[in-house]
Structure formats: C-alpha cells, structure tokens
Amino acid sequence: MYKVKYVLALVGAAVGYMVGDIDGLFIALIIFVVIDYITGVVKAIYLRKLSSEVGAVGILKKICIFILVAVANVIDHYIMKVGGSPCRTSVIFFYLANEGISILENIAALDVPIPEKLRNILENIDKDTQ
C-alpha cells in the first residue's frame, strides 16, 4: 500500500514539475478538459453515436493538451529562461478557448440554447490566441 502511495506521489511531483505551477489557469484548463469530454460523451449518447474507439482517441487528445503545456513550460523556464510563463500561459489560453468553444458546440447539439455573451467571450479569447 505504501509503495502505491510513493509511486503516485512521485508521478504527481514529476507531472507538477513538468507542467509548472498548479495555478488558476491550469485548474481552469483541467476543468474545461473534463467538461468537454463529458459533454462530448453526452452528445454522442444523444445522437446515438457513442463509440469506445472515438472516446479513447478523445482521451489521447486531452493527454496531448497537457503534454503541450509541459513543453511550453520547459520552453519558458529552460530554453528562454524568462520570468513568468508567457509561452505556457499562451498555450493554456489557446486550449481554454478551444475547449470552451467545443463545450458550447456539444451543448448546442443537445438543442440547449447558448447565451450569446458566453459565446462571444470564448470566441474573443480564441481570436486573441490565434
């Protein structure tokens, strides 16, 4: 039992080191990724297109998002050696906008009305990160 705890602690520390601070932006990204996956599954059920293969590919894509955050963090701290995390922050904002728009698309496919203000905010973030 203790070995499992140590391994999990080691993995958690390594991941935390690679992705940088577990700050509000990173937590928001985790939340958006989880909500996008859940709404994607709900949409697939609603449209009767649920597929374990598509779901597995979706999970792999979500993992790649966090790999790219880690790459951006390494660029910031070990290649560019800049204060703060401008590259990491930009990558997180890009994926926040991307995941947010995907969430809206998934929910809209369920015939749920989407507040225009929310759509505009996410589209503006997306434009700013392009």
Please state what every model-predicted region is:
Residues 24-38, 53-59:
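Loop-to-helix transition at the N-terminal end of transmembrane alpha-helices
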Residues 16, 29-39, 65-73, 94-102:
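Alpha-helical transmembrane segments of multi-pass membrane proteins
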Residues 78-106:
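Hydrophobic alpha-helical transmembrane segments and immediately flanking/interface helices
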Residues 47-67:
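Juxtamembrane helix-capping/reentrant segments at transmembrane boundaries
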Residues 38-48, 100-108:
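Juxtamembrane membrane-interface segments at transmembrane alpha-helix termini
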Residues 1-9, 63-67:
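Short hydrophobic alpha-helical membrane-embedded segments
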Residues 1-6, 96-130:
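Membrane-proximal cytosolic segments adjacent to transmembrane helices
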Residues 8-27:
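Membrane-helix boundary elements
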